[in-house]
Amino acid sequence: MANLIFDKVQIEATIDKIVDRTMRMDMTWDWPCGVAYYGICEAYEVTKNERYLQLVKDRVDENIELGLPRWTVNTCSMGHCLITLYQHTGDEKYLNIAKSKVEYLEKEALRFGDHVLQHTVSVNNDFPEQAWADTLFMAGFFLLRTVSYT
């Protein structure tokens, strides 16, 4: 098998550009934001670039101040960055919001069939009796990440 050759400086510069572009986007507390910020948090975990974590923290704090939406499966995607923020800052507010998402998923989220989480984009029940692959990321993987905190 051939050795993987890469330019670390170029990769980190590319990550910087992606992070900067992402942070210029006007995103709300929903699936796109949750997935994007999860990516930035993962970039932080790999590079240890504190700026990435601070950018996510500042934006999440701003969104918290503006007010949290009603929970849906889609809005639970933001839980991933909340877990990362709690892990690295120790600030309980992030954990408390994540726990409220867990409670929603366990007790209130719409389900069908054999207790399968239903894909919900809004409170209008847009996709009755549907489970999507991204539901696994937004809800299933999130629940796995919170096990040691709940």
Model regions and ranges:
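Well-ordered alpha-helical segments within folded domains of soluble proteins
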Residues: 29-44, 71-87, 131-147
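N-terminal amphipathic/basic leader segments beginning at the initiator methionine
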Residues: 4-6
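Alpha-helical structural elements
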Residues: 24-26, 32, 127
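Long, well-ordered core segments of solenoidal/helical folds
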Residues: 9-27, 51-70, 96-116
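Extracytoplasmic mature domains of secreted/periplasmic and thylakoid-lumen proteins
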Residues: 79-81, 85-135
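Conserved small/polar residues in nucleotide/adenosyl-binding loops
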Residues: 150
